[in-house]
């Protein structure tokens, strides 16, 4: 397998040794290890690998942290969308440069007529970055940085303050919709643990005679999904798209499938001519065509809400799971993004309410801000200290984002290895304070998950009732 990349690089996720050691991604882990080694290592990681021992200093830190006084305040956005339906759309690989008026007109219009967080960053954690975003947005925490544990293995942890639990307390039904099965990333188990009523996978329906379920349009066109999405009066729907997934080639995958559909539609045919030859397309062109399919799904969603007279009382939150790191040709990213540091993780995030609230937020945000921002907008009472991120619409919000190699960015400076590598130098004491704060957030995140601390908090609360 070779040697691992000790530092995060653009291609770390491809390194066989990194894949094997992290064991974060089912598919890639199987590819590098083979079925027998995969089975053995999966058993070891899940059941045998030594668990972390209890450290008294860790517990004291958590005790002090979670006994701090509440500091959040109301603002002009508090309760703005109270009692609205909520649809969260997690976009697969829709990088910033893919949202254009030409390629993705629906997303482009929504983004520019909503609350647009223009300095937003997703978390790159090697394989499994899609589920890492699901984990962050639903729980307010991210995959640990100081030790290796897959996000989807925290299904035995208690998350009483997750998005689903808090919205269900307000009388909402909460469901998730995706292409893939409930077994993949143990989504069925995890979503139930987070408080969801159901996780629905198109593949699980068992009604498809082909693989057309990989097209995002099916998330809305499928009659069963459509019925489940809108059958209740107050609902939260978490929709995870798929079509803009690798590979980006006309030789196989979703790009090839879409080109076939385009040709059949344009020529009013049911089958391709025997002499048909697929055109050659660059990875970028395929990515744009696949993104257009996701945009078509969004168009169908808005049409469905309009037909059901739900558009005015439904808020849609949209963000991307990760930048398009699955491209083979990095020069594509070099054209559109900063690629020599973790700012490559810059991705879209916006909140749309039928073109009624247009605002640009330039402060730095990340997936960790999504949940507390939603809770405030819906006027749902929550304890701000129970999350790593804070409400990005708060009057006193000054954001920063940290990455898996402990580098961080606050909108003015990018710090790597404790020193400023981008932006103007700042006072050494201020830099020391900021470095300390980032490490404190990571420590809080990792220890809370390690010790399943919310289970202890909930047990104490139940004893006082």
Named regions from a protein language model:
Residues 29-79:
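N-terminal, intrinsically disordered, polar/charged segments of Gram-positive cell-envelope systems
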Residues 60-465:
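Solvent-exposed soluble domains appended to multi-pass membrane proteins
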Residues 1-42, 105:
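Transmembrane and membrane-interface helices of multi-pass
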